[in-house]
Design a protein with these regions (language model features):
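Bacterial N-terminal signal peptides
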Residues: 2-13
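Hydrophobic, well-structured mid-protein blocks that either form specific transmembrane helices
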Residues: 93-140
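Acidic, serine/threonine-rich low-complexity disordered tracts
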Residues: 17-101, 138-236
Length: 236
Protein backbone atom coordinates (compact mmCIF):
# COMPACT_ATOMS: atom_id res chain seq x y z
CA UNK A 1 0.00 0.00 0.00
CA UNK A 2 1.17 3.56 -0.73
CA UNK A 3 2.31 6.22 1.72
CA UNK A 4 -1.27 7.50 1.82
CA UNK A 5 -2.09 4.64 4.15
CA UNK A 6 0.72 5.51 6.52
CA UNK A 7 -0.45 9.10 6.95
CA UNK A 8 -3.66 7.98 8.62
CA UNK A 9 -2.75 4.67 10.22
CA UNK A 10 -2.95 5.81 13.84
CA UNK A 11 -5.72 4.63 16.19
CA UNK A 12 -6.56 3.83 19.79
CA UNK A 13 -9.26 3.59 22.42
CA UNK A 14 -12.99 2.90 22.36
CA UNK A 15 -15.76 5.20 21.15
CA UNK A 16 -19.29 4.39 20.04
CA UNK A 17 -20.67 7.82 19.12
CA UNK A 18 -21.01 8.93 15.51
CA UNK A 19 -17.87 10.63 14.18
CA UNK A 20 -17.88 14.34 13.40
CA UNK A 21 -18.71 15.44 9.87
CA UNK A 22 -15.45 17.11 8.95
CA UNK A 23 -13.36 17.97 5.93
CA UNK A 24 -9.71 18.57 6.78
CA UNK A 25 -7.27 19.82 4.13
CA UNK A 26 -3.53 19.38 4.62
CA UNK A 27 -0.51 20.85 2.88
CA UNK A 28 2.23 18.25 2.29
CA UNK A 29 5.89 19.19 2.64
CA UNK A 30 8.83 17.02 1.57
CA UNK A 31 12.47 18.11 1.74
CA UNK A 32 11.38 21.71 2.50
CA UNK A 33 9.25 22.02 -0.65
CA UNK A 34 5.48 21.93 -1.17
CA UNK A 35 4.77 18.41 -2.39
CA UNK A 36 0.98 18.25 -2.60
CA UNK A 37 -2.35 18.29 -0.80
CA UNK A 38 -4.36 15.72 1.17
CA UNK A 39 -8.07 15.97 1.99
CA UNK A 40 -9.58 13.85 4.77
CA UNK A 41 -13.39 13.61 5.02
CA UNK A 42 -15.51 11.90 7.69
CA UNK A 43 -19.13 10.77 7.62
CA UNK A 44 -21.27 8.79 10.11
CA UNK A 45 -20.16 5.39 8.74
CA UNK A 46 -17.35 6.12 6.31
CA UNK A 47 -14.17 8.11 5.79
CA UNK A 48 -12.20 9.04 2.70
CA UNK A 49 -8.77 10.40 1.89
CA UNK A 50 -7.63 12.02 -1.35
CA UNK A 51 -4.00 12.84 -2.00
CA UNK A 52 -2.52 14.66 -4.99
CA UNK A 53 1.06 15.69 -5.65
CA UNK A 54 1.96 19.21 -6.79
CA UNK A 55 4.80 21.29 -8.20
CA UNK A 56 8.22 19.73 -8.76
CA UNK A 57 7.23 16.51 -7.03
CA UNK A 58 4.31 16.08 -9.41
CA UNK A 59 6.61 16.68 -12.37
CA UNK A 60 9.02 14.01 -11.18
CA UNK A 61 6.50 11.50 -9.81
CA UNK A 62 2.82 12.33 -10.15
CA UNK A 63 0.57 10.92 -7.42
CA UNK A 64 -3.24 10.80 -7.35
CA UNK A 65 -4.57 8.49 -4.64
CA UNK A 66 -8.11 7.99 -3.37
CA UNK A 67 -9.03 5.85 -0.38
CA UNK A 68 -12.39 5.06 1.20
CA UNK A 69 -13.36 2.93 4.19
CA UNK A 70 -16.73 1.77 5.50
CA UNK A 71 -17.13 0.94 9.19
CA UNK A 72 -19.61 -0.07 11.89
CA UNK A 73 -19.80 1.34 15.40
CA UNK A 74 -17.44 1.64 17.18
CA UNK A 75 -15.37 2.29 14.02
CA UNK A 76 -14.93 -1.43 13.24
CA UNK A 77 -13.79 -1.68 9.62
CA UNK A 78 -16.02 -3.61 7.20
CA UNK A 79 -14.37 -2.76 3.85
CA UNK A 80 -11.89 -0.42 2.21
CA UNK A 81 -10.90 0.56 -1.33
CA UNK A 82 -7.71 2.24 -2.52
CA UNK A 83 -7.29 3.56 -6.06
CA UNK A 84 -3.73 4.70 -6.59
CA UNK A 85 -2.07 6.38 -9.55
CA UNK A 86 1.63 6.80 -8.77
CA UNK A 87 4.06 7.41 -11.60
CA UNK A 88 3.38 4.72 -14.20
CA UNK A 89 1.57 2.46 -11.71
CA UNK A 90 -2.22 2.13 -11.56
CA UNK A 91 -3.45 -0.08 -8.76
CA UNK A 92 -6.74 -0.93 -7.05
CA UNK A 93 -6.62 -2.51 -3.59
CA UNK A 94 -9.80 -3.83 -1.99
CA UNK A 95 -10.01 -5.20 1.56
CA UNK A 96 -12.99 -6.95 3.17
CA UNK A 97 -13.05 -7.32 6.95
CA UNK A 98 -15.26 -10.31 7.85
CA UNK A 99 -16.03 -9.93 11.54
CA UNK A 100 -17.93 -13.24 11.74
CA UNK A 101 -15.09 -15.29 10.23
CA UNK A 102 -12.36 -13.23 11.85
CA UNK A 103 -10.56 -12.76 8.53
CA UNK A 104 -9.37 -9.80 6.47
CA UNK A 105 -9.14 -10.50 2.72
CA UNK A 106 -7.11 -8.29 0.36
CA UNK A 107 -7.09 -8.25 -3.44
CA UNK A 108 -4.70 -5.96 -5.34
CA UNK A 109 -5.15 -5.41 -9.08
CA UNK A 110 -2.92 -3.89 -11.75
CA UNK A 111 -5.36 -1.68 -13.67
CA UNK A 112 -3.04 -1.27 -16.66
CA UNK A 113 -2.53 -5.00 -17.18
CA UNK A 114 -6.03 -5.84 -15.90
CA UNK A 115 -4.59 -8.57 -13.70
CA UNK A 116 -4.56 -9.58 -10.04
CA UNK A 117 -1.21 -8.75 -8.45
CA UNK A 118 -1.79 -10.34 -5.06
CA UNK A 119 -4.43 -11.91 -2.83
CA UNK A 120 -3.83 -12.34 0.89
CA UNK A 121 -5.72 -13.07 4.08
CA UNK A 122 -5.01 -12.23 7.70
CA UNK A 123 -6.63 -13.40 10.90
CA UNK A 124 -8.24 -10.52 12.83
CA UNK A 125 -10.28 -10.01 16.01
CA UNK A 126 -13.99 -9.18 15.88
CA UNK A 127 -13.34 -5.43 15.69
CA UNK A 128 -10.22 -4.15 13.97
CA UNK A 129 -9.02 -0.74 12.80
CA UNK A 130 -7.62 0.21 9.41
CA UNK A 131 -6.13 3.43 8.11
CA UNK A 132 -8.71 6.22 7.92
CA UNK A 133 -11.29 5.43 10.60
CA UNK A 134 -8.32 5.10 12.93
CA UNK A 135 -7.95 8.84 13.34
CA UNK A 136 -11.57 9.12 14.46
CA UNK A 137 -10.97 6.92 17.46
CA UNK A 138 -7.86 8.81 18.41
CA UNK A 139 -9.87 12.03 18.41
CA UNK A 140 -12.56 10.54 20.64
CA UNK A 141 -10.20 9.01 23.22
CA UNK A 142 -7.83 10.88 25.51
CA UNK A 143 -4.59 9.21 26.55
CA UNK A 144 -2.69 11.32 29.07
CA UNK A 145 0.88 12.42 28.36
CA UNK A 146 3.27 9.70 29.47
CA UNK A 147 0.70 6.94 28.93
CA UNK A 148 0.30 4.48 26.06
CA UNK A 149 -2.17 1.94 24.74
CA UNK A 150 -2.12 -1.10 22.48
CA UNK A 151 -4.73 -1.40 19.75
CA UNK A 152 -5.71 -4.05 17.14
CA UNK A 153 -4.91 -2.97 13.58
CA UNK A 154 -4.84 -4.57 10.13
CA UNK A 155 -4.13 -3.41 6.58
CA UNK A 156 -5.52 -6.64 5.11
CA UNK A 157 -2.07 -8.19 4.85
CA UNK A 158 -1.06 -8.30 8.51
CA UNK A 159 -2.59 -7.95 11.93
CA UNK A 160 -0.81 -6.52 14.97
CA UNK A 161 -1.40 -4.87 18.30
CA UNK A 162 -0.02 -1.39 17.63
CA UNK A 163 1.37 0.61 20.54
CA UNK A 164 0.53 4.33 20.58
CA UNK A 165 2.34 6.68 22.98
CA UNK A 166 1.16 10.12 24.18
CA UNK A 167 4.55 11.81 24.35
CA UNK A 168 4.31 15.49 25.26
CA UNK A 169 2.47 18.80 24.91
CA UNK A 170 3.71 21.20 22.23
CA UNK A 171 2.63 24.53 20.75
CA UNK A 172 2.89 24.36 16.96
CA UNK A 173 2.07 26.56 13.99
CA UNK A 174 0.45 25.45 10.71
CA UNK A 175 -1.16 27.39 7.83
CA UNK A 176 -4.46 27.08 9.75
CA UNK A 177 -3.11 28.83 12.87
CA UNK A 178 -1.20 28.26 16.11
CA UNK A 179 -2.33 25.41 18.36
CA UNK A 180 -1.67 23.88 21.76
CA UNK A 181 -1.30 20.16 21.03
CA UNK A 182 -0.41 16.73 22.34
CA UNK A 183 2.08 14.74 20.27
CA UNK A 184 1.50 11.01 19.77
CA UNK A 185 3.71 8.34 18.20
CA UNK A 186 2.20 5.28 16.53
CA UNK A 187 4.60 2.34 16.40
CA UNK A 188 3.29 0.77 13.20
CA UNK A 189 6.40 0.91 11.01
CA UNK A 190 9.53 -1.29 11.10
CA UNK A 191 7.63 -4.47 10.29
CA UNK A 192 4.81 -4.08 12.84
CA UNK A 193 2.20 -3.34 10.15
CA UNK A 194 4.31 -1.67 7.46
CA UNK A 195 7.79 -2.84 6.49
CA UNK A 196 9.21 0.66 5.92
CA UNK A 197 11.75 1.84 8.48
CA UNK A 198 10.88 5.04 10.29
CA UNK A 199 8.64 6.76 12.85
CA UNK A 200 5.08 8.14 12.62
CA UNK A 201 3.81 11.08 14.70
CA UNK A 202 0.53 12.97 15.00
CA UNK A 203 -0.36 16.20 16.81
CA UNK A 204 -3.93 16.69 18.13
CA UNK A 205 -5.21 19.93 19.61
CA UNK A 206 -5.17 19.83 23.41
CA UNK A 207 -8.90 20.52 23.80
CA UNK A 208 -12.24 18.74 23.47
CA UNK A 209 -12.18 18.95 19.66
CA UNK A 210 -8.82 17.15 19.34
CA UNK A 211 -8.26 18.20 15.74
CA UNK A 212 -5.32 16.50 13.97
CA UNK A 213 -3.26 19.53 12.94
CA UNK A 214 0.00 17.81 11.96
CA UNK A 215 1.02 14.35 10.77
CA UNK A 216 4.69 13.55 10.26
CA UNK A 217 6.56 10.55 8.86
CA UNK A 218 10.28 10.41 9.56
CA UNK A 219 11.54 7.79 7.14
CA UNK A 220 14.96 6.44 6.25
CA UNK A 221 16.88 7.59 3.16
CA UNK A 222 15.95 8.26 0.40
CA UNK A 223 12.43 9.34 1.41
CA UNK A 224 13.31 11.38 4.50
CA UNK A 225 10.68 13.41 6.35
CA UNK A 226 7.15 14.03 5.04
CA UNK A 227 4.94 16.50 6.94
CA UNK A 228 1.21 17.18 6.61
CA UNK A 229 0.11 20.47 8.19
CA UNK A 230 -3.53 21.47 8.57
CA UNK A 231 -4.43 24.15 6.05
CA UNK A 232 -8.21 24.33 6.36
CA UNK A 233 -11.03 22.83 8.45
CA UNK A 234 -14.60 22.72 7.12
CA UNK A 235 -17.92 21.34 8.37
CA UNK A 236 -20.05 20.87 5.22
Amino acid sequence: MSLLALFFAITLGLAAADPPKDRLTYSIEWRLIHAGEAVLEYGPSSASVKLESAGLVSTLYKVQDAYRVEFDAPFCATSSMMNSSEGSRRRETAVTFDRNRGRASLTEKDLIKNSVVSKTEAQIPNCVQEVAAALLRLRRTKVEVGQSTQIPMSDGRKFAQVKVDAQERERIKTPAGTFNTVRYEANLLNGVIYSRKGRAFIWLTDDERRVPVRILLRMNFPLGTVTLDLEKEEHP
